[in-house]
């Protein structure tokens, strides 16, 4: 991983190991940020994404990649953290059961803490409100509200060194995201998007995340390097 110099600006980037967050790392790097990536081992059934996140961080030259352990399966309430709840394999009405309660709020809070320690003022997250599953913590209103909270709740914020929550994919279609990442050199074969990925990172091809990914590559006119089981 690359070395940091005192002249470089720092950013903390939430990196799940999926398509969207990998694209965000590449975007931040292209803007000249020294990238500090953060992933979470939160009890998710698709733990293969953690290996993918490490690969992406290494490939895109993150200064440091940090994995935080959380026990969100102790709370449950989601098909991603409770093995007794099946992952839906067809679209459904409303917010799907793959929504993890307060996940992005928790993740951004920990990223905020790390950013304050690092002296970073920008936090990147790969949320999208166009081609997405309808999660409430992916909407622009959430991002804007969290930024306001961040600047009220931190020493840096109240001392005038405010934080910006960057969500560069917010209004892009999935195909636009794929094209943007490809133009920036993202190797999407390193990523894992599937909610039911096996230990080797192979995808089911049936869940909502697989569907959105497949549609994105198809609309972009590009081959999807996803491996399936």
Curated annotation (Swiss-Prot):
Its cofactor is Zn(2+). Belongs to the QueC family. InterPro entries: QueC, Rossmann-like_a/b/a_fold. Pathway: Purine metabolism; 7-cyano-7-deazaguanine biosynthesis. Zn(2+) binds at residues 194, 204, 207, 210. The lineage of its organism: Bacteria, Pseudomonadati, Pseudomonadota, Gammaproteobacteria, Pseudomonadales. The keyword Manganese does not apply. It holds the Pfam family QueC. Catalyzes the ATP-dependent conversion of 7-carboxy-7-deazaguanine (CDG) to 7-cyano-7-deazaguanine (preQ(0)). One of its GO terms (biological process) is queuosine biosynthetic process. It catalyses: 7-carboxy-7-deazaguanine + NH4(+) + ATP = 7-cyano-7-deazaguanine + ADP + phosphate + H2O + H(+). The gene is queC. Binds 1 zinc ion per subunit. The keyword Nucleotide-binding applies. One of its GO terms (molecular function) is zinc ion binding. It comes from Pseudomonas savastanoi pv. phaseolicola (strain 1448A / Race 6) (Pseudomonas syringae pv. phaseolicola (strain 1448A / Race 6)). This is 7-cyano-7-deazaguanine synthase. Its EC number is 6.3.4.20. Keywords: ATP-binding, Ligase, Metal-binding, Nucleotide-binding, Queuosine biosynthesis, Zinc. ATP binds at residues 15-25.
């Amino acid at each position: 991983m690359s070395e940091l110099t005192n002249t470089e600006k720092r950013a903390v980037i939430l990196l799940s190991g999926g398509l969207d967050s990998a694209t965000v790392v590449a975007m931040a790097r292209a803007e000249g940020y020294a990238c500090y990536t953060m992933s979470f081992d939160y009890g998710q059934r698709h733990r293969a994404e953690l290996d993918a996140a490490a690969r992406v961080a290494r490939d895109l030259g993150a200064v440091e990649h940090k994995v935080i352990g959380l026990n969100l399966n102790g709370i449950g309430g989601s098909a991603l953290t409770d093995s007794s709840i099946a992952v839906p394999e067809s679209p459904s009405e409303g917010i799907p059961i793959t929504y993890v309660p307060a996940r992005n709020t928790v993740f951004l809070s920990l990223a905020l803490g790390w950013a304050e320690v690092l002296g970073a003022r920008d936090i990147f997250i790969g949320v999208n409100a166009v081609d997405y599953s309808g999660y409430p913590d992916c909407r622009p209103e959430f991002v804007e509200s969290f930024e306001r909270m961040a600047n009220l709740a931190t020493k840096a914020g109240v001392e005038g060194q405010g934080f910006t929550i960057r969500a560069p994919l917010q209004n892009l279609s999935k195909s636009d995201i794929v094209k943007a990442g490809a133009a920036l050199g993202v190797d999407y074969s390193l990523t894992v998007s599937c909610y039911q990925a096996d230990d080797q990172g192979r995808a089911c091809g049936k869940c909502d995340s697989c569907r959105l990914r497949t549609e994105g590559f198809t609309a972009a006119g590009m081959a999807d390097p996803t491996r399936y089981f």
